[in-house]
Amino acid sequence: MKEKSADVIVVGAGIVGLAMAYHSAKKGKKVVVIERSQQAQGASIRNFGLIWPIGQPSGPLLDRALRSRSTWLEVAGEAGIWLHQNGSLQLAHHQDEWDVINEFYSTNSHEGFQIELVAADKAKQLSPGTKTAGLKGGLLSSTECTVDPREAISKLPGYLEKKYGVEMVFGTVVTSIEKDQVATADITWRGEKIFVCSGADFETLFPETFQQSGITKCKLQMMRTGVQPHAWKVGPSLCAGLTLLHYGAFKDCKSLPALQTRAQTDMPDLIKWGIHVLVSQNGNGELVLGDSHEYGLSLSPFDREEINQLIMSYLGTFFEAHDMAINERWHGVYPKLEGKTEFVARVSDHTTIVNGLSGAGMTLSFGLAEELTNIL
């Protein structure tokens, strides 16, 4: 069996692994990334492509998200990745939603967020697909960006190879890691630092560590339309009232329980499947819609059309576009550790697991990787 070496070995070429490779290589390290597929096929390519700082609470997590955003702007420009700094617009069609948004604005407008309250007519100007019937107003944020995750995850490896000399090894399964050795079918790699960024695959490497952590998996269902006619644009990425219940940025709002109570009473099926709805638009003009949240270690590979219909029904309460015909449906699975924003475990002197960003990988990975490569 051949032996090769690197300063840093990264297992997994999803966004977490690529971020670890980027910040390691930027520090002058010789880096190799080993990925089991010919290109990462997991949650990193099955999401909205949203860099979403507005969802993170003020403090360290918002700072991490904003650092990630800065890195995305730099990397996308250099790698030829389409990135749109289109911001986000959170719509409120009910008074309890408007109460939460106003409270959030009053307590967070000077906490690092770049936000403003907008009236219903301004919301319609910003996003022509907004439905104005019953619209109270919205929360406009300028920090959110959109990429096409399929393009980004495809182009980042070549960028890392060309600019930083990162060696990308695709179609290769890591079978074991012991001390400073990473074994594949035909090569044993030696590395001073090893980062395991295996996404939703908890079973192959260090399964006992994952089992002890209490980490689980989340399945989300998503859809994509065709290209919108006449170069129609959504404007800022959109969301509505249920999104206020999903993100940690809003959890301390004293007005949130009233919204939670109404949602459980009036929309029990949406709550059951963890549905809140986001709308993003990629560079081709296609709309990406979703999503739902089902949790467990053995999630069904079969999607529920009921969930897709619930998503589309709720979407129809606040948004419409020229062409809402669905061209693609899929699901993604990401790791989640309840009550935590990431799972970082030092399993040996050489090896660290970096995982479990709980659905915020596009938003937080570059910032987390910067922090970890500074201290490990």
Language-model features, listed with the residues they occupy:
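Core beta-strand elements of the Rossmann-like FAD/NAD(P) dinucleotide-binding domain
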Residues: K4-A6, T184-K193
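Active-site substrate-recognition segment that forms the wall
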Residues: Y22-H23, I51, W82-L83, S198-M324
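C-terminal catalytic lobe of FAD-dependent flavoproteins
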Residues: G274, N282-V288, E294-L376
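Helical element adjacent to the flavin cofactor pocket in flavoenzyme catalytic cores
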Residues: L140-E178, W189-K193
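N-terminal Rossmann-like FAD-binding beta1-loop-alpha1 element of flavoenzymes
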Residues: A6-V32
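Short beta-strand to alpha-helix junction loop
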Residues: D63-R64, L91-V100, L139-G158, F302-I307, ...
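Dinucleotide-binding Rossmann-like beta1-alpha1 core, especially the glycine-rich loop
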Residues: F48-L126
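Glycine-rich FAD pyrophosphate-binding loop
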Residues: K26-I45
